[in-house]
Amino acid sequence: MSKAFDVMVVGGGHAGCEAAAAAARLGARTALVTHRADTIGAMSCNPAIGGLGKGHLVREIDALDGLMGRVADQGGIQFRLLNRRKGPAVRGPRAQADRKLYARAMQVALAAQPNLEIVEGEADDLLVTEGRITGLALTDGRTFGCGAVVLTTGTFLNGLIHMGEVQIPAGRIGEAPARGLSGTLARLGLTLGRLKTGTPPRLDGRTIDWASLEMQPGDDDPEPFSALTTALPNPQVSCGITRTTQATHDVIRANLSRSAMYSGRIESTGPRYCPSIEDKVVRFGDRDGHQIFLEPEGLDDPTVYPNGISTSLPEDVQLAVLATIPGLERVVMSRPGYAIEYDHVDPRELEPTLEAKRAPGLFLAGQINGTTGYEEAAAQGLLAGLNAARRAGGGEGVVIDRAEGYIGVMVDDLVTRGVSEPYRMFTSRAEYRLTLRADNADQRLTQRGLDLGLVGTERAAVFGRRMAALDAARERARTLNITPNEAAKHGLALNKDGQRRSAFDLLAYPDITLETLAGIWPEFGALEPAIGAQLEIDAKYAVYLDRQAADIATLRRDEDLVLPDELGYDGLPGLSNELKAKLTRVRPRTIGQAGRMEGMTPAALALLVTYARRTGSKKDEVRTA
């Protein structure tokens, strides 16, 4: 054997970077295996991080001392807070990124991480001893011993690119696919499937008629992702906005038979919420146009990413399509768009720790689990890396539940329900989104990260100072109070009931702001802006959070009822054959997870509750890894 590590991570994309960094932060001797070190942190598709739901994940990664938020701040060239006019629960931070700056910042961060080594090579096979993962073999003959492996293969597992009639075996354009690992996973008994995603053509921005287009600038007060970022280093750029036309749609309809999607060459399912331009024209044929965002890929790079027209049409048709779009009539295409098919593992094969049920020591994260998106991949990577390090060290696994974070919502959805199409995070997937806000990710998760040893000293210090300031502001707001008559002197119309109301109570009123309170108690005007904003959000949500706490208590009660691993569902009377098969496949760990399974009925769940209570199993008595 060449060398031994505690954890080996395969893949240098967003999931792999977070997995390797998390394992190393826990003290595990970690190797990141990638084809080429210079592609680590590459943004394979759109040059952006965050968005609705996705921005919440980035903030949670940051709260656990992950890298994506910090790196996005260093590489960001346009920052916007989406849904700014709506409530804080559904606001989503987003940043356009310079591809080169982002990848460079990620590579620098990993190079500075103690306990982490980069190994260039292609993973070929897993070494298994008595059913447990014990090492990794590369295609060049090198073998490594390890306590756990994290696979973050992205679109590389038997990847096949489609551009019209052209098919190219590749993990992404210009890079070879990974062929051996799919066979290894099948040999281990894991169920594999096939999914598809796509990317649009790239354009030479110097040939775009920007003067004819609507421009979208960044926010005047850009908000960073990371709590550690004190200043954003790069100038902000604007994006252009254009639309397809009826002429565009006519060209696409005339050439559908040449599209890989519509000619039958691709049979796998693509992401519902990121459809190709062919899909948009076919499914929404009554629309007169579809919006396209023209996103610069870098400060010193003329390449532009036309967000909204991913395609599998041939190159000549792509050029014809572009010529019909306002502002792009004379555009030069730097690289054609394409669709890519790849293998994935049914995520119901996994524990909520992201460890494979049939292969102890094997963890999966990212697109291999049927998700789409950088942020979804990175969040899974962090959790998988954390648990791989704990597995290698003989510790128990860590589960983030649906009431703790969007990471928990996503993983629970995956391992409980599986996927029929690439999974994307939305705020609507979370039952407790008033609690799971982007603004309070650190309050929800950083202390847990500290307890696990996942959070470093710099973040611990920043978090400690922030919480001390916030606690002091809350305490002061609850201490200061006023009568309705006193409030009236300051222009506040309160119910004349004689009751004194605290400053915190007053902030819960929709028309009362921190600025209003500063007119009564000037000390509120002296609060650090971030602390003041957080205080106001906390106050306005307080009554709703109290109600949601009861729902969370119910969730926790159900999650405390454990279903034994060895439970034979075929022998349980009262269950339909369909449910017996689903329960046997998923093997839910708790009553809560069983209740979220597709097809579960109240009667069947009541039967399982009775059985779980009779067995007397408690969550803390059951190993979670």
Swiss-Prot record:
The keyword Acetylation is assigned to this record: no
Molecular-function annotations in GO: flavin adenine dinucleotide binding
Gene3D superfamilies: FAD/NAD(P)-binding domain, GidA associated domain, C-terminal subdomain, tRNA uridine 5-carboxymethylaminomethyl modification enzyme MnmG/GidA
Cofactor names: FAD
Keywords: Cytoplasm, FAD, Flavoprotein, NAD, tRNA processing
Swiss-Prot/TrEMBL GO biological process terms: tRNA methylation; tRNA wobble uridine modification
Intracellular or extracellular location(s): Cytoplasm
InterPro entries in UniProt: FAD/NAD-bd_sf, GIDA_C_N, MnmG, MnmG-rel, MnmG-rel_CS, MnmG_C, MnmG_C_subdom, MnmG_C_subdom_sf
Short name of one Pfam family: GIDA
Residues engaged in binding NAD(+): 270-284
Any single GO CC term annotated in Swiss-Prot or TrEMBL for this entry: cytosol
Role noted for this protein: NAD-binding protein involved in the addition of a carboxymethylaminomethyl (cmnm) group at the wobble position (U34) of certain tRNAs, forming tRNA-cmnm(5)s(2)U34.
PANTHER family in the cross-refs: GLUCOSE INHIBITED DIVISION PROTEIN A, PROTEIN MTO1 HOMOLOG, MITOCHONDRIAL
HAMAP family found in the cross-reference section: MnmG_GidA
Family: Belongs to the MnmG family.
NCBIfam families in UniProt: mnmG_gidA (TIGR00136)
UniProt protein name: tRNA uridine 5-carboxymethylaminomethyl modification enzyme MnmG
Lineage, broadest ranks: Bacteria, Pseudomonadati, Pseudomonadota, Alphaproteobacteria, Hyphomicrobiales
Encoding gene (name): mnmG
